[in-house]
Amino acid sequence: MSLRGKILSVVAAIAAVAIAFVCAQAQIATKSIQFDLRKIGESVYEARSKNGKWPAQIADLEETEYLKMPHRRTMLEEGAFVIVWQQDLDPNPDANRSRVLVYDNSSLLSRFGRVWVCRGDLRIERISTQEMLALNVRRQ
């Protein structure tokens, strides 16, 4: 094999390793985001079950599992995840299937249009840019 061929082989191998690393990191980040979204969604229902009212602010989530985890309050206060405060949810999560409880607002993935949400039935899914824009309009 020529010197040029060896160099190209090494460059290709390094590129493959770099791509694999980035993909693995993105997968880890996605799983972390999904974990937080699900726990926040669960905390909305947990708060409702404790005092009979839907939470309307971060303080209303006190004593829920999510806020007992380290650094979670700060993440909410800094807007890493945005809770869509709603007072007209059904206590049965399945009835809230089309509603968004919380979404990822500050990850690198969300900045590139991969926005993850927790639906009212606690499903985690990506939403389209159009859905995200509509959600932001309703929040204002």
Predicted regions and their residues:
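Surface-exposed, charged secondary-structure patches
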Residues: A80-S106
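Active-site and glycan-interaction determinants of carbohydrate-active enzymes
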Residues: D104-S107, R111-R119
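Short, solvent-exposed coil/turn segments at beta-strand boundaries
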Residues: A95-R99, C118-R123
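Small-molecule pocket liners
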Residues: V44, S98, R114-W116
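Sequence-pattern detector for short linear motifs
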Residues: I7-S9, N51, V117
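Conserved hydrophobic/amphipathic alpha-helical signal-anchor segments
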Residues: A15-I83, Q87-D90, R123-Q140
